[in-house]
Amino acid sequence: MVRSYVLLFFLLFLATGIFGQEYTISGHVRDQSNGEVLIGANVYLKGTTTGTTTNAYGFYSLTLTSGKYTVVCTYVGYSRKEIDLRLAGDTTLDIELMPKTTELEEVVVEGEKRNSNIVSMDMSLDKLTSETIDKIPVLMGEVDMIKTLQLLPGVKSTGTLSSGISVRGGGRDQNLMLLDEATVYNASHLGGIFSVFNNDAIKNVELYKGKIPARYGGRLSSLIDIRMKDGNMKEFAGEGGIGLISSRLTLESPIVKNKGSVILSGRRTYMDGVIKMAKKVSGSDRINEFPFHFYDLNAKANYRFNRNNRVYLSGYFGRDVFSYSIGQTNN
């Protein structure tokens, strides 16, 4: 009899250990068309409140007990995806979402519910993607990220046609600007008319107007965290544009398919060349040359060793060229 009780107790203890075992589901969420990681994608279990969001590298992780689950992944602008799985051990689940176009018949604007700005954890954070910035009306054909930020609440320009911003009354030198975690000290071209950020190379922008994370310091007003695109990991791609005063070209290519990629994006103004050519063709001395032009280049190489380790090298090079000659006047 005692032996039966001991055996029963052992079986109950073993069953509790088996059914109480916890395992981890983790992986990356990517764009199915080009392999770009999706930041802030929602990953949760269907029919429950258990879930998480992807971090700045598109990575997510969920710790669950063993059993059957339906994992749901959603992201704005992409089709919803559901995956059924049986969890019996640590599992790697990489998810690819297909972009989706949604046509809206009308737009309804409503006020936020009462006290929503108090209970929200991110009430001082604004997020913009390159697609959103592209939709904003541009100056002389040039999409400008800083000009877009100036349209947000609590942000204003520091001067007419200036790429500097003042956040909640602070000075332009009180803003911390980061490009792939590297500090940008001078963010303007052409005397402040244009910013140094080429939107074709930017993935997303986060503006912290308050409640700045503790790992960032040295500024009083705001944090502007800019992330560059990783590049297309599936196929070679390119895009470009011609504006009134400048042209730009972006090239993306996989180094190793679905493992590594590289992106190059450059632009240059040519108003100086156009005016010089017009002066030469017309033969008139009344046309004054434009003594200013700028060019810049963004580059990034990215390689993923495995789901937990990746390395990237990003860089920016820009130059403003100003030349002016003073002729002699005979009196």
Each model region followed by its residue ranges:
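Structural motif
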Residues: 21, 27-38
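A short, amphipathic beta-strand motif
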Residues: 25-31, 58-60, 95
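Short, acidic, small-residue-rich periplasmic hinge/interaction motif at the N-terminus
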Residues: 30-33, 41-46, 72-78, 88-137, ...
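Short, acidic Ser/Thr/Gly-rich low-complexity loop/linker segments typical of extracellular
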Residues: 48-59
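Membrane-embedded beta-strand positions in outer-membrane beta-barrel channels/transporters
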Residues: 94, 106, 146, 164, ...
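Periplasmic N-terminal accessory/gating domains of Gram-negative outer-membrane beta-barrel systems
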Residues: 110-212, 229-230
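Transmembrane beta-barrel wall of Gram-negative outer-membrane proteins
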Residues: 243-268, 284-321
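Outer-membrane beta-barrel translocator domains and adjoining extracellular loop/strand segments
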Residues: 275-281, 315-318, 323-330
